[in-house]
Amino acid sequence: SESYHHLGFHSESLEPTLAPTRRVIVPEQAGPYIQFQNPGLTDDADAHTMGWPAPELGPEHNANRIITVFPLCSLTLSPNWIGWMRVTPGPAVDRHDVRLLYMVPPDAREWDGFEQTFAPLKQFVEGALQEDMSGLRALSNTHHSKLTDRTAGFSPLEATVAHFQRWIVDRMTAS
């Protein structure tokens, strides 16, 4: 779903808080992972702020980067927390189980305002995930439509999808 943010999956959650460029760098890389960074207004801007989950939570809670390891996990890294999304294939080809885990330092519950900070953080992340799932359902419907042009290539904005497909093919054809 990270590859499709340009389609407006997160117009209510992430989009208003991202830097005005609203673009994500997908570095050329090999291997079973992808990494997203939002560089801000310019390429040389501080890459350590994706500007979410919510500006009012402060920079110490903003995600620095998202790393996805194919095919089963995604990490959202920030100075004070890590979000771990574990994906387990489900009983059907089009179903899977998603578990969200939030990791904080051992003494985090002793911080002033911990509950007031992490409750909206969880609500924000889980809301964005719901938007992802709705968007992916729409993409799946599009993919299965008789009107879909299956000969069209990926947009440069979908570089991670192409990278994932290359990785799958490499793994399936490895001897």
Question: Positions of the model-derived regions?
Answer:
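C-terminal catalytic domain of Rieske-type non-heme iron oxygenases
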Residues: 1-175
